[in-house]
């Protein structure tokens, strides 16, 4: 069960009592997340008029880009800023220029040179320590660790230029 930090009293006490009264099992775990803040550190709120409409962002950039930003850049437990400028920076550096370039390079080499990987090579077994972050709901920490590896791979490909050596 997730709740905002301003709602912990209700979720951890009153809601649990309501569940018990309805003979429904209590929550075993309550994950308390921070606020998403806007310009000036003000908490985003529809009722206060301090939020962006995520549908507008999804229409312009795609829902996956918005999901990427929210999972990678928004801290699971602390307040995190969201501005259109910060979103655009993350979109351009992370998706368009980062993973976009890396995916293009790797897929081109894999297709042109018939690179095949085994199921074991494609598994997440190398990330057993990082997967613990997911078990503790620290999603952005998990993604940032994997993102660091992807960035390292992209830098390695740029530096060694394996596509030139295969020709």
Regions found by a protein language model. Give the residues of each.
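Active-site cores that bind ATP or allylic diphosphates and position pyrophosphate for catalysis
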Residues: 1-5, 14
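Glycine-centered helix-coil hinge/cap
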Residues: 4, 61-62, 138
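Secondary-structure transition/capping motifs at alpha-helix termini
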Residues: 19-28, 113
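Catalytic adenosine-cofactor/nucleotide-binding cores of aminoacyl-tRNA synthetases and other
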Residues: 34-122
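Helix-rich, typically C-terminal accessory recognition domains appended to large enzymatic cores
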Residues: 88-122, 126-167
């Amino acid at each position: 069960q997730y709740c905002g930090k301003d709602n912990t009293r209700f979720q951890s006490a009153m809601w649990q009592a309501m569940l018990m009264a309805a003979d429904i099992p209590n929550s075993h775990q309550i994950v308390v997340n921070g606020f998403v803040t806007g310009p000036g550190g003000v908490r985003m709120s529809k009722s206060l008029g301090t939020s962006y409409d995520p549908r507008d962002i999804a229409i312009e950039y795609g829902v996956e880009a918005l999901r990427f930003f929210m999972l990678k850049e928004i801290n699971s437990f602390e307040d995190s800023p969201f501005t259109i400028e910060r979103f655009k920076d993350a979109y351009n550096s992370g998706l368009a220029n980062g993973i976009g370039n890396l995916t293009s390079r790797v897929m081109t080499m894999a297709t042109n040179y018939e690179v095949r990987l085994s199921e074991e090579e494609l598994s997440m077994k190398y990330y057993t320590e990082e997967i613990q972050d997911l078990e503790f709901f620290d999603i952005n920490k998990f993604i940032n660790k994997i993102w660091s590896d992807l960035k390292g791979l992209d830098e390695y490909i740029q530096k060694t230029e394996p596509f030139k050596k295969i020709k």
